[in-house]
């Protein structure tokens, strides 16, 4: 009987190798049995081979990647990361491509930075795969929608109470928030300028096409393979938008939850910017989640440090690479409606404030040997709205120009050197305690190569 089973399996494989005509003939002679078996063999052969996740060394200092939110401006972070990995590859002995999920131990992001974090970490995509997916996401999701109605002036008329701009200089980040306010004011209730169902469909499709989650578009966020990179995204509960809510692919001993959240649900939650996408209800309790940037954590590098401390108590941090999406160069407001933008002005400046706190903290406790590096294209992409997918080429050009400057090349080399130290087991600095105690007398130090926000 065992021999017969083996022969049948071998014969099924042979039939499959003969092609469709032979399968049809075999199918008619065997009431479909061999045809079904051959089809199953063919399907197995068509599935891409999944490379095993290499063992992770948890004894060496940790490498962390933090990704800011910023809509289409997040494209810039992928270009910076690609340059970093190419330089890293050039300096490695074997000159092999480097997978972000294997190089970094923790990748955390907010908003579209959260989507990128899931792509690179949980889904184990290469940076080129993530760039292609991000381009497609931006074009498919942001084409159309209500944004044009807001921007063409029909919803910004001063004749409508409370909607007149009355503003002086106003740039992309401030305009993003004003659009939120305009739509919310005109359309009561939970409104959105873009189709959440379209976004969900694209996310599911992308997840189901990746080798690591092939044909599993509903794969859970929590990763069964503990060797894989830890991935985290920053969201907020709609009924408590002042506090960040971190969704994780790993277990945080200080925040044990069993939500059974799917990858696509996490991606939807972190990208649910008010008015751009409706909140998403997750779990049996149907808690509504929104974009974590509303909590003031558009730059999640501070949370990244705290997450690392919770996951690996006492473990040293060798590199914390924080990638931003630009910061406003000037903000000038005038008119009676200025107060409506106050909350967002604080938010738009928050990436710089978080950078200052993290930089100050590390330099204070590391005695000049900080593992923290911040890179962000300044004053050239900040005027681009988060949904302006037609500006991807401009974002790429500005980022390449930024990377070509000497001080940024120096900063890039500093980040690579910090990462190399983790391989050599050179002692880095561990950081006990939380960020609550910060010295106000210490001047803001520069991240390697200068400041960034």
Regions found by a protein language model. Name each.
Residues 2-453:
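Conserved catalytic cores and adjacent C-terminal regulatory segments
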């Amino acid at each position: 009987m065992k021999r017969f089973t083996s022969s049948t399996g071998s014969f099924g494989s042979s039939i499959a190798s003969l092609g469709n005509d032979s399968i049809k003939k075999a199918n008619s002679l065997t009431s479909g049995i061999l045809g079904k078996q051959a089809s199953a063999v063919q399907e197995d052969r068509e599935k891409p081979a999944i490379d095993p996740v290499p063992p992770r060394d948890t004894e060496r200092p940790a490498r962390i990647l933090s990704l800011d939110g910023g809509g289409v401006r997040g494209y810039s972070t992928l270009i910076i990361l690609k340059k970093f990995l190419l330089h890293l590859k050039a300096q490695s002995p074997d000159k092999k491509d480097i997978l972000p999920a294997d190089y970094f131990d923790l990748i955390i992001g907010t908003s579209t930075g959260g989507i990128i974090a899931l792509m690179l970490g949980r889904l184990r995509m290469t940076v080129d795969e993530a760039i292609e997916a991000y381009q497609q996401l931006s074009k498919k999701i942001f084409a159309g929608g209500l944004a044009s109605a807001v921007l063409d002036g029909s919803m910004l008329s001063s004749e409508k109470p409370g909607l007149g701009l009355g503003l002086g200089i106003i740039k992309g980040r401030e305009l993003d928030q004003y659009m939120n306010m305009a739509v919310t004011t005109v359309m009561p209730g939970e409104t959105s300028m873009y189709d959440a169902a379209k976004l969900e469909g694209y996310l599911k499709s992308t997840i189901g096409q990746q080798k690591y989650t092939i044909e599993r578009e509903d794969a859970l966020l929590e990763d069964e393979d503990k060797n894989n990179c830890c991935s985290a995204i920053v969201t907020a509960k709609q009924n408590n938008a002042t506090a960040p809510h971190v969704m994780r692919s790993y277990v945080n001993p200080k925040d044990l939850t069993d939500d059974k959240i799917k990858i696509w649900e996490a991606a939807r939650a972190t990208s649910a910017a008010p008015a751009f996408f409706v909140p998403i209800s997750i779990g049996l309790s149907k808690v509504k989640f929104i974009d974590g940037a509303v909590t003031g954590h558009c730059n999640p590098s501070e949370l990244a440090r705290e997450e690392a401390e919770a996951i690996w108590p006492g473990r040293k941090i060798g590199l914390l690479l924080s990638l931003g999406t630009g910061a406003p160069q000037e903000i000038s407001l005038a008119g009676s409606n200025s107060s409506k933008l106050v909350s967002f002005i604080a938010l738009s400046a928050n990436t710089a404030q978080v950078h200052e706190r993290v930089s100050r903290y590390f330099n204070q406790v590391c005695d000049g040997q900080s593992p923290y590096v911040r890179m962000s294209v300044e004053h050239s992409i900040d005027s681009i709205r988060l949904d302006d997918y037609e500006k991807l080429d401009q974002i790429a050009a500005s980022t390449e120009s930024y990377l070509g400057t000497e001080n940024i090349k120096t900063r890039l080399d500093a980040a690579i050197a910090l990462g190399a130290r983790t391989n050599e087991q050179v002692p880095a600095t561990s950081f006990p305690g939380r960020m609550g105690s910060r010295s106000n007398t210490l001047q803001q130090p520069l991240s390697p190569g200068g400041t960034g926000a």
